[in-house]
């Protein structure tokens, strides 16, 4: 959740709570509040609606919480979205953030690998899966290692790059501990990885 005070036309209308964390969600809520107030909706009704809003499918969606480990599924597949998600995670948790990212499209990886490296600056541990190609054919020299190498060059943090789901799960089993947030990010099959990992956590942690 996130809490903030609303000041409208110089008047403090009080505190509002939204059911999702992150500065970007606060900004969206403020825009919605402004529209509501301008069209005559009272702040109490607006605040009640916002408090019950818990987000949309695959947008920082908490899929499981077991043994102090929070597992999140997130659709972010552009550097700006990735950064916003990780900042939201940082705002609600003092534990480690472990990001499992599946790059989407060879062309996007080629164009934005440097921006992706910077977007992951908030994560404590980065795990990269192979690129999800969707409709694209491979581009020579373009793999997840572009992001991996750029990240390692700029941020002295723990990071891994794997080609197989089994390798990812093996590494997670080795490193995940109490109070960690594990975020599965991407627009491809990574959401299936997340569901499978939730089952693993429930059964083995």
Regions found by a protein language model. Name each.
Residues 167-198:
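A glycine-rich beta-strand to alpha-helix segment
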Residues 117-178:
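C-terminal helical cap/extension that packs against the catalytic core
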Residues 2-4, 8-125:
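Nucleotide phosphate-binding/pyrophosphate-handling subdomain across enzymes
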Residues 19, 72-73, 162-163, 184-185:
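Thr-Gly-centered strand-to-loop micro-motif
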Residues 103-106, 131-134, 187-190:
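Short glycine-rich anion-binding loops that position phosphate/pyrophosphate groups of nucleotides
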Residues 14, 107, 136, 192-193:
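Glycine/Thr-rich phosphate-binding loops of Rossmann-like dinucleotide-binding domains
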Residues 84, 111-113, 139-140, 173, ...:
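Short amphipathic alpha-helical segments
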Residues 128-131, 200-205:
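Short, flexible loop segments at boundaries between secondary-structure elements
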């Amino acid at each position: 959740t996130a809490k903030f005070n609303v000041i409208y036309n110089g008047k403090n209308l009080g505190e509002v709570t939204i059911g999702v964390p992150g500065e970007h969600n606060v900004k969206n809520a403020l825009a919605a509040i402004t529209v509501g107030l301008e069209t005559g909706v009272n702040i109490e009704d607006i605040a009640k609606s916002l408090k019950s809003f818990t987000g949309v499918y695959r947008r920082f969606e908490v899929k499981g919480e077991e043994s102090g480990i929070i597992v999140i599924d997130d659709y972010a597949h552009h550097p700006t979205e990735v950064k916003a998600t990780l900042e939201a995670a940082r705002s609600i948790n003092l534990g480690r953030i472990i990001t499992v990212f599946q790059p989407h499209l060879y062309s996007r990886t080629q164009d934005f690998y440097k921006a992706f490296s910077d977007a992951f600056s908030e994560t404590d541990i980065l795990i990269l899966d192979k690129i999800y190609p969707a409709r694209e054919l491979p581009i020579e020299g373009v793999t997840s290692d572009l992001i991996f190498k750029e990240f390692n060059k700029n941020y002295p943090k723990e990071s891994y790059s794997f080609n197989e789901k089994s390798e990812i799960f093996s590494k997670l089993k080795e490193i995940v501990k109490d109070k960690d947030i594990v975020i599965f990010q991407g627009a491809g099959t990574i959401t299936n990885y997340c569901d499978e990992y939730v089952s693993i956590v429930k059964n083995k942690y």
